[in-house]
């Protein structure tokens, strides 16, 4: 399932685990279940901090959960998290294993303070392994579930669970459903969503907290509305002049985030939207904006 190069990389990453974790697989007699069993067994061979059980009783089969040893699994993959989702699997292993996520400290505190929503605290994300936007959503909900025991999340490979896709009338991926385990049928959202957007939607007091943060800031000489390339460029220009500068935006990067291939950015032969936005954001953070 995993080639020698990936196994070696996995062994290196799993050295970052701070406490033992357990992979619990729920299997059936299908060929895909044998693939899932092989995957979890190979992961278990990469670290003495990873144990494997094959006696899970989760409804969706084949699937497997990642749990801190002695706890119930709150991060689960229904299907094979390969392709674009392999990074989601790797981060899920690390975060459940106690390695801190690369998230702003105030966002982590906000996640830890979330209360279980009235609509249920179990989320299911239907994905496609070829989807470019799906990993961000899967990783966001996995991070929330790893940090806050009130929440749990299952990634569902729509290609492997076609009857579920048809039953829930999934028309696009990623689509996120909310509810309780075994009954997550209410649509929470679809398409690209950032961790911050998801947390804000789950946090009933998010608007008041954001307003308080804004009120605590000083006055701005220049306040730029929009966080796309033009907004980032204008903000850097203003900040370099020594004036107090801020950016107001729903999501940094704007439409560029949803653009996969970019070949008309002068001096750069080819890049991708998320990669360009990450570079823009890092550049903006070099200044007091």
Predicted regions: what they are:
Residues 3-41, 113-149, 154:
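Local sequence-structure signature of Cys/Sec-based thiol-disulfide redox active-site neighborhoods
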Residues 23, 123, 222-224, 245:
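Conserved hydrophobic helix-helix packing surfaces used for dimerization/oligomerization
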Residues 36-39, 257-289:
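N-terminal Rossmann-like dinucleotide/flavin-binding domain of flavoprotein oxidoreductases
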Residues 68-100, 178-210:
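Non-catalytic, surface beta->alpha helical segment in thiol-disulfide oxidoreductase systems
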Residues 145, 235, 239:
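Gly/Ala-rich phosphate-binding loop of Rossmann-like dinucleotide-binding domains
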Residues 213-230:
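Beta1/beta-strand and adjacent pyrophosphate-binding region of the FAD-binding site
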Residues 240-258:
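Glycine-rich FAD pyrophosphate-binding loop
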């Amino acid at each position: 399932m995993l080639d020698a190069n990936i196994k070696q990389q996995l062994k290196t990453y799993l050295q970052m685990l701070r406490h033992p974790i357990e992979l619990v697989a729920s299997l059936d007699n299908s060929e895909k279940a044998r693939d899932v069993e092989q995957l979890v067994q190979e992961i278990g061979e990469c670290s003495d901090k990873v144990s494997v059980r094959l006696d899970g009783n989760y409804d969706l089969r084949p699937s497997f959960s990642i749990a801190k040893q002695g706890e119930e699994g709150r991060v689960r993959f229904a299907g094979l998290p390969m392709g674009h989702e392999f990074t989601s699997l790797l981060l899920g292993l690390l975060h459940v294993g106690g390695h801190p996520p690369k998230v702003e400290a105030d966002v982590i505190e906000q996640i830890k303070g979330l209360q279980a929503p009235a609509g249920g605290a179990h989320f299911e994300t239907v994905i496609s392994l070829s989807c470019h936007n799906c990993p961000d959503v899967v990783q966001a909900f996995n991070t929330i579930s790893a940090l806050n025991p009130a929440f749990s999340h299952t990634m569902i490979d729509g290609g492997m669970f076609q009857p579920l896709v048809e039953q829930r009338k999934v028309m696009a991926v990623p689509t996120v459903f909310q509810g309780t385990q075994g009954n997550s049928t209410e649509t929470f959202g679809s398409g690209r969503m950032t961790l911050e957007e998801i947390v804000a939607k789950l946090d009933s007091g998010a608007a008041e907290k954001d307003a308080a943060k804004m009120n605590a800031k000083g006055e701005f000489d220049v306040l730029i509305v929009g966080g796309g390339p033009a907004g980032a460029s204008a903000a850097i220009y203003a900040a370099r002049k020594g004036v107090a500068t801020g950016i107001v935006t729903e999501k940094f990067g704007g439409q560029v985030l949803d653009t996969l291939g970019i070949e008309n950015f002068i001096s750069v032969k080819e890049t991708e939207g998320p990669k360009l936005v990450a570079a823009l954001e890092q550049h903006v953070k070099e200044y007091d904006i």
